[in-house]
Curated annotation (Swiss-Prot):
GO terms for cellular component: cytosolic large ribosomal subunit. NCBIfam families: L27. SUPFAM superfamilies: Ribosomal L27 protein-like. This is Large ribosomal subunit protein bL27. PANTHER family: LARGE RIBOSOMAL SUBUNIT PROTEIN BL27M, RIBOSOMAL PROTEIN L27. It comes from the Bacteria. Residues 1-22 are annotated as: Disordered. InterPro entries: Ribosomal_bL27, Ribosomal_bL27_CS. PROSITE patterns: RIBOSOMAL_L27 (PS00831). Pfam families: Ribosomal_L27. It comes from Escherichia coli O6:K15:H31 (strain 536 / UPEC).
Amino acid sequence: MAHKKAGGSTRNGRDSEAKRMGVKRFGGESVLAGSIIVRQRGTKFHAGANVGYGRDHTRFAKADGKVKFEVKGPKNRKFISIEAE
């Protein structure tokens, strides 16, 4: 004879896979055109010179050169640009 009542099943216990966001190439690093610099949600980093953005807001290099991070404007926005070598 059972000494415990049957335990009910839970409806939780799920989690999504990590999306591997963040900075992939840091300031001063050399990059080739097409290299991903930052993976992000929204516009935490804005595109500066020689930087493009994908449809998921990924920032990537449009030209070969060195990565440069800078804060500009009255709202202190973070911009990424590529300085040609």
